A protein has these predicted regions:
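Structural signal for interior beta-strand "rungs" in well-ordered beta-sheet cores
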Residues: 1-119
Length: 119
């Protein structure tokens, strides 16, 4: 089965959501209705899956809006994925700016993340 660690934040799994075996989830984490974490997925925390998303590989600090997919291996961090977006197999993103400066996230995106976390 999956491994769930809520020491760093709550984990909410909605009715009809599925976490496949071998997955590791660290809170805070929200998974809305009908979403699926594929086999062996690693969620490092601060992640929200909107309704009917499919997620695999590694994710950290990501908001997936409804029906968005990242169903295969690869790393995705510090991102907002819009509704109906699909990331192909082995998609990777960097969460480090190429000049090593701090990344700045707009207030709008932070508000959106809090909305999905139901704050």
């Amino acid at each position: 089965g999956p491994f769930l660690n809520s020491e760093d934040g709550p984990i909410y799994i909605a009715k009809g959501a599925e976490i496949m075996e071998g997955s590791m989830v660290r809170g805070p984490f929200v998974m809305h209705e009908g979403s699926v974490l594929k086999l062996g997925t690693k969620v490092y925390g601060a992640t929200t899956l909107g309704p009917y998303c499919k997620v695999g590989g590694e994710v950290n600090n990501v908001v997936f809006q409804g029906y968005a997919n990242k169903a295969h291996d690869g790393f995705l961090g510090n991102s907002v994925i819009g509704e109906w977006c699909n990331l192909g197999a082995d998609t990777n993103s960097s969460n480090l700016k190429n000049n090593f400066l701090i990344l700045v996230l707009s207030v709008y995106l932070i508000s959106l993340h809090l909305l999905y976390l139901n704050f």
